[in-house]
Swiss-Prot record:
One of its GO terms (molecular function) is all-trans retinoic acid 18-hydroxylase activity. This is Cytochrome P450 26A1. It is found in: Endoplasmic reticulum membrane; Microsome membrane. It comes from Mus musculus. The gene is Cyp26a1. The lineage of its organism: Eukaryota, Metazoa, Chordata, Craniata, Vertebrata. Its cofactor is heme. It catalyses: all-trans-retinoate + reduced [NADPH--hemoprotein reductase] + O2 = all-trans-(4S)-hydroxyretinoate + oxidized [NADPH--hemoprotein reductase] + H2O + H(+); all-trans-(4S)-hydroxyretinoate + reduced [NADPH--hemoprotein reductase] + O2 = all-trans-(4S,16)-dihydroxyretinoate + oxidized [NADPH--hemoprotein reductase] + H2O + H(+); all-trans-retinoate + reduced [NADPH--hemoprotein reductase] + O2 = all-trans-18-hydroxyretinoate + oxidized [NADPH--hemoprotein reductase] + H2O + H(+).
């Protein structure tokens, strides 16, 4: 074969496909930015739109933290991208996030990716809008009132204490912390939010299957909107259907109990409140909406708290001087001696545990369970000198906003003392946002705070522990968790501080 033939062969084999690929990237970029608002003179934010159709979704899913850090270094606090099938602007920094969170209904509206809307359903609180959202939130908030939280304290302490005894019985072989914490938080959410008694600690087969179904659903919650066999969306919907089938049994049993008994005036779980709200309005119970709401409550009530509790175990294990100060505070309230029958927790005592509150805040600053929130632009508006076109998705980043917040010094250091002296509210309101903010802030944030305080108290007064692999590598999918599931060995705390 002569040289011209070799060159022609190389051109056809390598050069031409490369040119076609580059042309496809350019055409895709032009197609995406063609949806900009041409009546607005402001430029789009900097950034790239990735590969045709897939955008930059695969890079973000596979290399999330590395990918996002690279983007932030290259483009700053606001940039365009293409995620989950939609042109998107990613936003971070207190000033930028303030505009987004305070612009609900005026500039932006909640708009989760298509996969989230499909899997969780249109009837869940996260996907409702306007008066429907306001009304549903008002009902659910009754389950998180101070009076209701007081009712939950002993239930949470009982579940946590029972779980820790199991961990301590594992001895030298240790255990994987993250899966165990997820099971614990799932049991607590079942009891408190849905009013279901899940059975003996450790969980039966049905409970384990439900936990595994939630794990499968969660893994595939943020997927490309392609519903074909073996796709992420397909697997997520399949797991969701299993969850709905199991939850429907609990809902029907609860309805029968409520119909057979008189109201006792005691604390009501969120599911009971939703059922009674429909009855009070003379509405026919919508089983599909109840299943969607129950699934969302269980997801939010155990997935995020499990992430935060696992991070607490990590940081307290890595920083023994912080654990020492936690125990000193517990001792000062008379709670360290486990044999004392008068040391039962209550809301008043928990609210006095200021240092533990600082430890939880610092944990949520460094490892916020939820990395951000999704919105859609209702109209074209200006942000930091750029146009945000109408119809584009907007993601505000919680983790990046914490990373760049000016109010925090030595940002990578775990230092709960930074929260002892409160920051001015105006400065910290949008620099520290583990529960989001504005009208869409987390409905169960007070429940989460109390749950994490009780968990920390019980952990500190029952256990010492060793992280077998040292500091873990953290991954987000969709909540933050340790890649190695945090293997650890637990022993009894002997009570000396």
């Amino acid at each position: 074969m002569g040289l011209p033939a070799l060159l022609a062969s190389a051109l056809c084999t390598f050069v031409l496909p490369l040119l076609l690929f580059l042309a496809a990237l350019k055409l895709w970029d032009l197609y995406c930015v063609s949806s900009r608002d041409r009546s607005c003179a402001l430029p789009l934010p900097p950034g790239t739109m990735g590969f045709p159709f897939f955008g930059e979704t695969l890079q973000m899913v596979l290399q999330r933290r590395k990918f996002l850090q690279m983007k932030r270094r290259k483009y700053g606090f606001i940039y365009k991208t293409h995620l989950f099938g939609r042109p998107t602007v990613r936003v971070m920094g207190a000033d930028n996030v303030r505009r987004i969170l305070l612009g609900e209904h005026r500039l932006v509206s909640v708009h989760w990716p298509a996969s989230v809307r499909t899997i969780l359903g249109a009837g869940c609180l996260s996907n409702l809008h306007d008066s429907s959202h306001k009304q549903r939130k008002k009902v659910i908030m009754q389950a998180f009132s101070r009076e209701a939280l007081q009712c939950y304290v002993l239930v949470i302490a009982e579940e946590v204490s029972s779980c820790l005894e199991q961990w301590l019985s594992c001895g030298e072989r240790g255990l994987l912390v993250y899966p165990e914490v997820k099971r614990l938080m799932f049991r607590i959410a079942m009891r408190i939010l849905l009013g279901c008694e899940p059975g003996p600690a450790g969980g039966g087969e049905d409970e384990q299957q439900l936990v595994e179904a939630f794990e499968e659903m969660t893994r595939n919650l943020f997927s490309l909107p392609i519903d074909v066999p073996f796709s992420g969306l397909y697997r997520g919907v399949k797991a969701r259907n299993l969850i709905h089938a199991r939850i429907e049994e609990n809902i029907r049993a609860k309805i029968r109990r409520l119909q057979a008994t008189e109201p006792d005036g005691g604390c009501k779980d969120a599911l009971q409140l939703l059922i009674e709200h429909s009855w009070e309005r003379g509405e026919r119970l919508d089983m599909q909406a109840l299943k969607q709401s129950s699934t969302e409550l269980l997801f939010g009530g155990h997935e995020t708290t499990a992430s935060a509790a696992t991070s607490l175990i990590t940081y307290l294990g890595l920083y023994p001087h912080v654990l020492q100060k936690v125990r000193e505070e517990i001792k000062s309230k008379g709670l360290l001696c486990k044999s004392n029958q008068d040391n039962k927790l209550d809301m008043e005592t928990l609210e006095q545990l200021k240092y533990i509150g600082c430890v939880i805040k610092e944990t949520l600053r460094l490892n916020p369970p939820v990395p951000g929130g999704f919105r859609v632009a209702l109209k074209t508006f200006e942000l930091n000198g750029y146009q945000i076109p109408k119809g584009w998705n907007v993601i505000y980043s919680i983790c990046d906003t914490h990373d760049v917040a000016d109010i925090f010094t030595n940002k990578e250091e775990f230092n709960p003392d930074r929260f002892i002296v409160p920051h001015p509210e105006d400065a910290s309101r949008f620099s520290f946002i583990p529960f989001g903010g504005g009208l869409r802030s987390c409905v169960g944030k007070e429940f989460a705070k109390i749950l994490l305080k009780i968990f920390t108290v019980e952990l500190a007064r029952h256990c010492d522990w060793q992280l077998l692999n040292g500091p873990p590598t953290m991954k987000t999918s969709p909540t933050v968790y340790p890649v190695d599931n945090l293997p650890a060995r637990f022993t009894y705390f002997q009570g000396d501080i």
